């Protein structure tokens, strides 16, 4: 990561009045769709053709009744700890096709593990000219590969963060394009184990699809790629670490401010400002946000939170991002946890992610 060359001038100032106007365009709704059982679509360049079925997104294939009928021969994701289901005479009626019920797995109406293709034609808004344009997939499962028209954009396979693709060089504002997404839910590089609650058919299920937000979004050419806040109670401040990305050298200024929420006590943190000069690519920026003498702390009894507002101004473009955080100190001493100096017992429940109707947790 390239180090930021900073002209440090941290001053207390008023909040900038200019706000970043990031745009978004929902791609929810009807998509063209096709199952690729033999995994031949990439070789045959299915991104160049029209797919032969349709599906509504966001959603999973089982939820939309796409895939194979469940039979006693279905290959499940998960260990079979009791195989008597397959030969016990008492269970015979539950092995009949069309009446299949399993005693230890959820039994969806449809099941599929493999590759499926999703395709949609869209026109990029003409007023997005000069902006960075991204495809945001909040929760695909598991691996995605994206094409715009015939250009491959890339592949991502994270199970814990959204898949985000930069389409700027592949699309033209005001003109139509075809977005094709190949989704593969086979267990490959991302192998959390066949009995992991996130994929096993005993609980959540190993589904193919895309859920949550599916959007085209814009950012300025200079933008916040990541913002992390580290509270420092002993010094009454928060350290804010930012990754600022740019397609070229740039300069400007960042303003940070914060206000309390999730509490009856109102506390506005005075803004601080810092100028920057960056290179193309990733640039690390660090700023300190003094919280004042009367800052609110977070714990289970008084869960006060803060909403950090970060404003980035670079020439004619600006961006605004918000991140929530709590002022709390968490330590381990011996066998005990301490939150803000108070000995704390942490309790929890075992949640197996059982969502038989959809295969995934609610995304709202």
Q: Locations of the language-model features?
A:
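Surface beta-strand/loop "capping" patches
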Residues: 218-249
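Bacterial Sec-dependent N-terminal signal peptides
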Residues: 1-22
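Beta-strand-rich binding/interaction modules
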Residues: 146-148, 237-276, 285
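Glycine-centered tight-turn motifs at strand-turn-strand junctions
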Residues: 175, 278-290
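Accessory beta-strand-rich segments of carbohydrate-active enzymes
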Residues: 25-27, 34-38, 67, 78, ...
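N-terminal carbohydrate-binding accessory modules
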Residues: 309-364
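Signal that preferentially marks extracellular ectodomain short beta-strand elements
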Residues: 165-170, 287-303
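Short, aromatic- and glycine-rich surface loops/edge beta-strands on solvent-exposed regions
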Residues: 178-181, 302-314
